[in-house]
């Protein structure tokens, strides 16, 4: 069955004019929602993501509760790694932990390839369920970027400084580029499978890429990113690039064949455009503001919207994920305000 969906988000991704500014929030599904916390009392993250009905329910919750203009598939960026031979455990209070970190070219050469229909069928089944039976807004698929995935694989878990990752990059360039190629292949195959299953846009999260300088990005990371965007682009869905702490890298994305640049709060939208970002923009509220009193939030959001709305092709989002402490009512009120204020301003 083909469902009719609200395409405001997709129009903004394509740089088209919209009646109002579309909004969705990174980590909109999950830890800040009481309904989700009740589910987590009974099921682990692994169990939720491996159960299409349960995962689809969690994915759809913020659409129903907050009236956001897009859903993003509820899963972890580490989800595809076991398929290529990486033993990952999500530990409460820590995050992803890998007991056997990458240390050599031999370790890289042991990595396999992903076959999504065989290795992650539950993800594809969740997408099909959502897009054929449940959603009236676009579903966003996603993947971690090679650098961020590699950082977990080399560090063995979250890191504050990525010393091991960068040391490996500098000291073992042959192994590094082999790892980038392996991960790029995985990301390409994984995103294509999500698109074939029904997602209407894809976002690549490079959560830790802000740790590298421009010259190193250009040499050690950008070639893999160029290949990912070039090979996924013919699939015909909007592609979003989001890096955290990556204001210094925005100019490196100008020649990547992507559709939307995701910004965090460190770079104002006006400044990004002044620096040559002439495609759609997504962002860029500091999620910390969501813990402030409503008048403070409203004034701050007005400022972001006033910058974003100066050109067609703007999507409101956070610069990083929703905190567990955020009141769901705040997100509902925020979406309503974004829609109403932007509609009023754009009608002038």
Swiss-Prot record:
Keywords: Cytoplasm, Decarboxylase, Lyase, Porphyrin biosynthesis. Gene3D superfamilies: 3.20.20.210. Its EC number is 4.1.1.37. The keyword Cytoplasm applies. Pathway: Porphyrin-containing compound metabolism; protoporphyrin-IX biosynthesis; coproporphyrinogen-III from 5-aminolevulinate: step 4/4. GO terms for cellular component: cytosol. InterPro entries: UROD/MetE-like_sf (IPR038071), Uroporphyrinogen_deCO2ase_HemE (IPR006361), Uroporphyrinogen_deCOase (IPR000257). HAMAP family: URO_D. Homodimer. This is Uroporphyrinogen decarboxylase.
